[in-house]
Amino acid sequence: MPADHNPSIKTSHGVLHLIPVGLGEAPISAWLPPDAQILAGQLSTYIAENAKTARAFLKLTPLTRPLQDITIHELNPRLDDATLQTWLAPLRSGVSIGLVSEAGCPAVADPGARAVAIAHQWGVAVKPWVGPSSILLGLMASGLDGQRFAFHGYAPVEAGERVKQLKAWELSSAKQHQTQMLIETPYRNQAMFTSLIEHLKGSTRLCLARALTTNDEWVRTLTVAQWKSQPIPQLDKFPTLFLFQAAA
């Protein structure tokens, strides 16, 4: 429903624009539509997961003002709600604001979801723009169930708890015919891969989606039993999405 016909949307307010950021070194033309590039270059205020990467992103857009004149608030999970509401307050005066993640789509596995929730509480229009999402791209390329899936973020760091959690997710996958997705800090990727092939069932299908949209992109899905007979893939230093689906 158009904003001007939706009584819950206040047309005197600005718009919270959810603008994706690239996952790697590909040119901006490969992952962000021209209209979104133009819009991104026009906004004067941003809320970002990481101010440094937000500035790097903005340098790729057709800026209409000097970069130093753009306000960038850095959002982290520990930020109090009162401060976040203060940053978003210009929306209620008709000023539009951009929301960006460190990489990929904002507000998906990202603290920016808090800003979106506040915008909805205030009746502010929220505009999501098309762009890269490692979760969606990895799922697309995996060949696993794309209708029932769950993204869990990080598994526990402690070895015993990690194994317990992986087995619980595998059981859930088998019962619900559901793809399970998780990530790890790049320097722990090799250890995570080892945990997966050591503790998941041999019939479980496991996909590695490494460095999506970059020159080092590599995606492969095999059963756990098949992975055990393969050379160990190089995963350290590369953002990697792990996906698996257990046999019913």
Predicted regions and their residues:
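A contiguous loop/helix-start segment that scaffolds small-molecule binding in enzyme catalytic cores
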Residues: 2-17, 71, 95-96, 174-248
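Glycine-rich, flexible N-terminal cofactor/catalytic loop recognition
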Residues: 2-75
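Class I SAM-dependent methyltransferase SAM-binding "motif I" and its flanking Rossmann-like core
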Residues: 17, 114-172
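Short active-site oxyanion
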Residues: 40-46, 123-127, 179-180
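Acidic beta-strand-to-loop metal/phosphate-binding motif
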Residues: 48, 98-106, 179-184
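Alpha-helix capping/helix-boundary segments
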Residues: 52-54, 104-105, 134, 188
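Conserved helicase motor
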Residues: 73-80, 155-159
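Glycine/small-residue-rich loop that forms an oxyanion/phosphate-binding "nest" at active or ligand-binding sites
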Residues: 81-126
